[in-house]
């Protein structure tokens, strides 16, 4: 996790109606020890998904665009089909942070040259007009620089499903080694932010959730091993 005050401060810069409680599930800040693992360099593309599953549910069409509009169950099925799995939330965040502890993987200031979020080209009323990443919706995977682990789009483009159930207070009692998330729940965690978010949503610490059977044109995934 990270200081939820950071998220609140950034959100306030672009939206004065932000509330600090929106970021409470990022607390408390805690250290976690993880065994070794591998994470896909890119978000799963529409081509990859269609080749493996036989269909492409995406709202935005493009072979090198990330697949979106996929349920958590479909993401899990795809990863298992190719001999992998969805990453845990802890694995995902560790990889997203890169080799530092900044607010964003690249530093402490929002930068439209580093991630696809809702800025000048975005058609939502809450867009951040003073920044411009050049995309209105999803971007082809790898369009932005990788973090210092060599991973692309860990910030923005599409949210990514992870394996964990969401629990507002899980961080207060989570294991210090290889946490797997709560044993049950109603909603699954999504990480990384997307083309539809304020910059605050693309921080490595940001957490959100949705029902596992939900389909959204701003949610995709990548696999782990």
Where are the regions a protein language model picked out?
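Functional-site microenvironments in short loops/helix caps that host divalent-cation chemistry
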Residues: 3-19, 58-208, 212-217
């Amino acid at each position: 996790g990270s200081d939820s005050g950071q998220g609140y401060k950034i959100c306030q810069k672009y939206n004065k109606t932000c509330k600090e409680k929106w970021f409470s599930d990022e607390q408390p800040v805690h250290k976690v020890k993880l065994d070794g693992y591998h994470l896909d360099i890119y978000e799963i593309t529409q081509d990859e998904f269609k080749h493996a599953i036989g269909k492409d549910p995406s709202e935005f069409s493009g072979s090198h665009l990330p697949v979106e509009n996929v349920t958590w169950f479909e993401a899990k099925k795809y990863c298992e089909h190719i001999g992998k799995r969805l990453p845990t939330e802890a694995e995902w965040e560790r990889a997203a942070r890169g080799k530092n502890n900044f607010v964003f993987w690249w530093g402490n200031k929002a930068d439209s040259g580093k991630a696809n979020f809702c800025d000048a080209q975005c058609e939502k009323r809450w867009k951040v007009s003073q920044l411009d990443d050049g995309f209105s919706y999803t971007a082809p995977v790898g369009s932005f620089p990788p973090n210092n682990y060599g991973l692309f789009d860990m910030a923005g483009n599409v949210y990514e499903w992870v394996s964990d159930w969401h629990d507002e207070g899980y961080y207060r009692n989570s294991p210090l080694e290889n946490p797997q998330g709560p044993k049950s729940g109603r909603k699954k965690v999504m990480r990384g932010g997307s083309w539809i978010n304020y910059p605050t949503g693309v921080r490595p610490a940001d957490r959100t959730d949705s029902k596992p059977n939900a389909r959204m044109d701003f949610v995709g995934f990548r696999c782990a091993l």
